[in-house]
């Protein structure tokens, strides 16, 4: 029954994306595109005819991404020089959709009192500061784009309302990202930007693990459908991969 409900919701999302939007030539930049959800984003957007720019810390090791024939750029979201260099290489290139996907996980079997503070800092650096750093650097490209969409990959675990313990660093990093997203939506909304945070579901990736119920293609299919129909009324909101709004 749960699977049927997901299928119906995904179909509704897909039908909601207009043919004009789906058929436009647009450029999407995806951070952390060498594996998992990021790679699946690249695969599905490329199949739809988008110009795809995928980033990876080590492009030479991103064989699956390279096989798609998309543009690959080196990027470490925690390194200001790396982000600035990417912005320099992309100078003058309009970007319609930025997907801040690069992220790291956290051990789920520890409580906040036992968490490794060095790991906590690293998780915040990647999952919270990284997306803001990339957004700041690529803002000229996004302003030159026609859609002006920024999608920050959050998680249901970032919801304060839904917190039931464990994953302290990851939860905190995604809650903080939600706040960053809200601030961006306010500051950039007046320019016509739509800035959202999304939860991909529990996905069977290296981070999600083998027990996760969702395959990457199912999760990303829903997310792509959601992204393609974003409009002003969605700005600043928090959605799951089926398009349902989540509590903060």
Regions found by a protein language model. Name each.
Residues 190, 197-200, 209-248:
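C-terminal helical subdomain
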